[in-house]
């Protein structure tokens, strides 16, 4: 009985060590920072032409200033991860995607919606929208291929 117990204990210890190594590898290695500013076309591309579905994002913050000078920010990590994961079932998944779709809209204060601040109900007229044209916007975060 002692030999079996020692074997099971050894396997358990090895598995725990492997899980710890995998956790450290995923959380502390391979993350590359990115930063886009107002007017940039935001394109995420895999370095080795692999599927964009394997790209993951972390700590992605969209920050913008409204026409009154107030600073607003929203965490868009989940949005970007879901956009990338959406390519999983594609027959020929691309190696890049551009924020804003096919029109490749440059980063601006409307790239992500913060309800009550820059949504359609709040910015209701063309005059309101023109006030937003010179507002600064940034998108920062970390990205990696898994």
Curated annotation (Swiss-Prot):
Q: What are the TM regions of this chain, as residue ranges?
A: 7-27
Please provide the record's keywords in A-Z order: Host membrane, Late protein, Membrane, Transmembrane, Transmembrane helix, Virion
Expression is induced as follows: Expressed in the late phase of the viral replicative cycle.
* Membrane topology of the entry: Single-pass membrane protein
Q: List the disulfide bonds.
A: none
Location(s) in or outside the cell: Host membrane; Virion
Q: Which GO terms describe its cellular component?
A: host cell membrane; membrane; virion component
Q: Which domain of life is it from?
A: Viruses
Which family does the UniProt entry place this protein in?
Belongs to the asfivirus E146L family.
Protein name as catalogued: Uncharacterized protein E146L
Taxonomy, top ranks, is: Viruses, Varidnaviria, Bamfordvirae, Nucleocytoviricota, Pokkesviricetes
């Amino acid at each position: 009985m002692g030999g079996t117990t020692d074997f099971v204990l050894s396997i358990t210890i090895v598995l725990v060590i492997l899980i710890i190594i995998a956790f450290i590898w995923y959380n502390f290695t391979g993350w590359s920072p990115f930063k886009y500013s107002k007017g940039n076309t935001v394109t995420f591309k895999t370095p080795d032409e692999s599927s964009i579905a394997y790209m993951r994002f972390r700590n992605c913050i969209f920050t913008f200033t409204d026409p009154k000078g107030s600073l607003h920010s929203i965490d868009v990590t989940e949005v970007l991860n879901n956009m990338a994961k959406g390519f999983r079932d594609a027959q020929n998944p691309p190696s890049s995607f551009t924020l804003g779709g096919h029109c490749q809209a440059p980063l601006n204060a409307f790239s992500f919606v913060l309800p009550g601040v820059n949504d359609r109900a709040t910015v209701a007229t063309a005059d309101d929208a023109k006030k937003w044209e010179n507002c600064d916007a940034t998108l920062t975060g970390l990205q990696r291929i898994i």
